[in-house]
């Protein structure tokens, strides 16, 4: 047993990655699935698609790697967070589509929660906001709107899970109804201080606690797969939500260590050690990982549009054919043009949390063209990251959160974007050799539990740097550019 199978179940596709005994990738497979938009602001997945693409990519990756069933020592799972699945305990059939983390159908209910003053209690216990982003209101919606669902849940006939829980249920043939602390911490039902489901919040949302999964450490025994899936039973030994898995994959194990993942959106997590820091700047307080029953906490900032701004250049403006073109365009852009893009296509995330505002462009002249738009698009990601780091610095007083920022995700491959990021935050930006940090984090959780991979200290020592981007921008220019960004955001919020 020399390999680890990492399952990375994401928002638009399912992936399976095989890691060898030295934590090198030997094979992978990926399959996209359909997105469903039944109403304005609604986003759903067919749970059957989540399962079929996961099982299919696992088999494909194992076949590509040329492995036998006995070669797989363990499975690690990482997943899109907050997405909700409810299914029948006996048949395993979902009662409704999975409601995705992006879904905003419960916005009016969340406003009612805030108006009635429940948001402070929710934040105090869970570290989260009263926002449709999180699982609790989605689960309540299913129980309230699917015929018979609430009665069946009360009778103990239905089960709830985030995507990891649903996949483990399917992988084990219904033998395990479990989750890990990082996924539980994103539901708005879990008390991150007491380490258990909150009776008070479950009562507020009218959620029967019997439908909630058992919560385990990130590295634990989550069950074994059905023998018919991969030729033999394989233990599932590691689970973490995608951004927490990336934090682990980046070896951000010490307080003050910070990572930022640049995909469709951007998620920055700051390790705050054994202290759950309450944010005064609308960041999220969450669990970074949990070992041996002891949680390590983090401050998290979420940006809704990062890599998606480049997709907008390609699909919306149609000024590029592929993302890699933006680097040369940004280099060609007229330095005397001060175009600022606020990419609030779906609102603004942390620290603003305004779901209603929309994107805007400032500083246009007759000479502004595709190159200036490309530069403004890449710069917007750096500006938003600085917003997060400023908020983190204010929340975690006395600590330098800008010592070094570790980056990963598709957009981190852009040298221009990473150099601008370093310039605007005035701190070094480290890009690792292994950019598949999310899958690596899940693989390490399972591998070290299986005895195949090194312990935490050994894994941290194995983290390898590909390139450091150091600040080069003049301080006065940095201040002028960021001040222009802040004015642009203020105008966007007031529009």
From Swiss-Prot:
Keywords in alphabetical order: ATP-binding, Glycerol metabolism, Kinase, Nucleotide-binding, Transferase
What GO MF annotations does this protein's record show? ATP binding; glycerol kinase activity
One of the GO biological process terms: glycerol-3-phosphate metabolic process
Q: Which Pfam families match?
A: FGGY_C, FGGY_N
Give the signal peptide as a residue range, or say none if absent: none
| Domain of life of the native organism | Bacteria
Reactions that this protein is recorded to catalyse: glycerol + ATP = sn-glycerol 3-phosphate + ADP + H(+)
**Residues annotated to bind glycerol:** 81-82, 133, 242-243
Check the record and name the SUPFAM superfamilies matching this protein.
Actin-like ATPase domain
Q: Which Gene3D superfamilies match?
A: 3.30.420.40
Q: Which residues bind ADP?
A: 11, 15, 264, 307, 410
Return the similarity comment: Belongs to the FGGY kinase family.
**The protein's name in its UniProt record:** Glycerol kinase
Q: Which gene does this sequence derive from?
A: glpK
